[in-house]
Structures are given as C-alpha cells and as structure tokens.
C-alpha cells in the first residue's frame, strides 16, 4: 500500500531488504538519497542502530508504522497512522503529473558481487512487466487468488506477484514468511489458484511428506524462477499444477525470458536481441577472438548472456 501511495504522487519508493542491519542498511539508505524513511515497528531497532550514520536526521522524516501492539513509538520518529488521520482524502495535485517514464521505485540487487546496487525501475517497466506476466504468464482474471509469500522488496514478489495481481484485478494472499508445513492448508483455505515462486521455496515443498491438503488443491498455475528439473516433475505429477511459467531475468536487466508455451524444464523465449558468449569464470573475464570481438557459444556449453541495448530494450541503470 505504501509503495502504491508513493507511486501515485510521483515519489520514488526505495525498497530495502528488511533483514539488513548495520553497514549494508546504512549503505542502502544513503546511496539512494532518501529524504524520508517509513519503518515497521519490528525493524525500528535495526534502524536505530544506524541513525548516526545515515543522511536522514529530522524526527518528522522518520515515519513509524505500528504492526503490533507490542512495540512503542521511539522518540526519534513520528506515528505514521496519526499523520494519515490528519491527511485529506482528496487526490493531491501531483497525481496529475505522474508519467510512464518517471521512476517508480529503486529495487536493490542482492549484493552477491559487492554492495547492493539500486536498480532504477520506471513506471513503464513496472507496468509492462506486470501486464505481460499477467496476460502471457498466469492468464488469470478477477476470479483468481494468488499465494505470495515472497518479499515485496525484490522483483519476483513485487512484479511477478503483486503487480500482476493488480493488473488482473485478482486477489492475493500475502504472507510475511513462507512455511512449507502450512502452505497447502493456506492454498485450500484461501482457494489460491496461482503461485509466485522461487526455486528454493518449491524445493522445500517437494521435500515435505504428502498431506491431505495437497490433494485436489486449486493451484493451477505458477510463475517464478529457479525451479530445478526434478522439482518441476513433482509439481506437475504430485501436486497437479497444469501450467509452470519459468522466468529468467534480472531487476536491472533489459531482457526477460518466459516459458510461454508451458514446455517442461525450460526458461522459454525472449523478444530481445541476445547472445551467449564464452566466459572464463576462474579469471573473471570475457574470452575474445584475435580481432577483439567476443566469441559466441556454438554448442550447448554455458556462457555469459549479453543483451543488446536499444530504444526497445532499455537499460535504466542504477
């Protein structure tokens, strides 16, 4: 709700991993040039630990959201709900000037090759991705409900999950943390017909003992990334999922592969201009021909995927 509200007035939402503490948390706040911070009560302690290291300093710029009654308002923040109660319910003038090219949010990379980087996500990318995923991937409508237990600060949970649901006019069951033991009970209770996944989540489910709740379940389609071939078979055969749409892409990437045709164990196709080139993993460098050009992969060997940047395949940067 917060992200949608910020987007409506043209403000940029900076989506920060809620498990971060210390220097990584400080880096994400400062590198994004954030001027205000909305923090859930359960994460206030982690934020308080870096208060003297971040660029946001005024009490009125820290908005504290009470999730449960067990937490109390810290003296360095103001109560978000109290501010909302004072707000006008009429649209602000700024809502009329928001454009498709404007930045919707910053989505941080995982930081596996260094510190997390804030990938720029314009409105048009958010809209195009969610529309394509809804229409060509899930093929859901207002009668469907999606199970989403992925973090909304990453592209999978946000774009493949929440935004696709909004585009479809469907409903969603959002869970703060995934639980393999209660998953099928939730699917049955909320009649979730769609699932947004990552491979690790599916592996946990595949390793569980069979339960009554998984029998005759309503789940018919799942979209996500990282599904291993052996787990793929389990979701088709044991769990009876008719359509599995594996995705391959990146938050900052300008190409998206999608298993549109429901072929087993494939990332599918893309309309972007791409090439697979030879890459030396040990030396961390591209292998080139004598004339300095890249060497294309001609067999089924692994390589480095590169994507041509064009007006139709834009790289928005960091």
Predicted regions located by residue number:
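A short helix-loop-beta submotif of the ANL/AMP-binding
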Residues: 1-14, 18-22, 27-36, 144-145, ...
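Structural core segment of the AMP-binding/adenylate-forming
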Residues: 8-83, 210
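Gly/Ser/Thr-rich phosphate-binding loop
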Residues: 167, 189-198, 206-282, 294, ...
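Conserved ATP/PPi-binding loop(s) of AMP-dependent carboxylate-activating enzymes
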Residues: 281-318
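Conserved pre-ATP/AMP-binding loop-to-beta segment of ANL
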Residues: 64, 69, 85-108, 115, ...
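Conserved structural elements of the adenylate-forming
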Residues: 88-91, 100, 119-141, 149, ...
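Conserved S/T- and glycine-rich ATP-binding loop of Class I adenylate-forming
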Residues: 6, 37, 103, 109-112, ...
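Conserved AMP-binding/adenylation subdomain of ANL enzymes
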Residues: 127-145, 153-194
């Amino acid at each position: 709700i917060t992200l949608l509200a910020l987007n409506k007035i043209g403000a940029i939402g900076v989506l920060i991993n809620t498990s971060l503490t210390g220097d990584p948390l400080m880096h994400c706040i400062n590198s994004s040039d954030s001027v205000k911070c909305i923090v859930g009560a359960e994460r206030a302690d982690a934020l308080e630990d870096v208060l003297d290291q971040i660029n946001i300093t005024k009490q009125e710029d820290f908005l504290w959201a009470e999730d449960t009654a067990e937490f109390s308002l810290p003296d360095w923040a103001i109560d978000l709900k109290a501010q909302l109660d004072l707000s006008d319910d009429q649209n602000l003038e700024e809502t009329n000037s928001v454009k498709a090219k404007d930045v919707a949010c910053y989505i941080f990379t995982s930081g596996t090759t260094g510190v997390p980087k804030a990938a720029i996500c314009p409105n048009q990318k958010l809209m195009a991705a969610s529309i394509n995923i809804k229409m060509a991937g899930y093929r859901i409508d207002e009668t469907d409900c999606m199970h989403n237990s992925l973090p909304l600060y990453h592209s999978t949970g946000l774009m493949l999950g929440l935004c696709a649901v909004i585009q479809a006019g469907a409903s969603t069951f959002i869970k703060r943390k995934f639980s393999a033991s209660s998953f099928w009970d939730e699917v049955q209770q909320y009649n979730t017909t769609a699932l947004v996944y990552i491979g690790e989540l599916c592996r946990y489910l595949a390793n569980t003992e069979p339960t009554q709740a998984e029998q005759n379940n309503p789940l018919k389609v799942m979209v996500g990334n990282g599904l291993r071939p052996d787990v793929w078979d389990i979701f088709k055969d044991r769990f009876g999922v008719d359509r599995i749409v594996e995705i391959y892409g990146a938050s900052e990437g300008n190409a998206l592969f999608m298993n549109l045709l429901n072929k087993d164990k494939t990332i599918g196709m893309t309309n972007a201009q791409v090439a697979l080139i030879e890459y030396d993993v040990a030396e961390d460098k591209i292998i080139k021909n004598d004339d300095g050009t890249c060497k294309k992969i001609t067999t089924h060997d692994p390589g480095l995927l590169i994507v041509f940047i064009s007006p139709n395949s834009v790289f928005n940067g960091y």
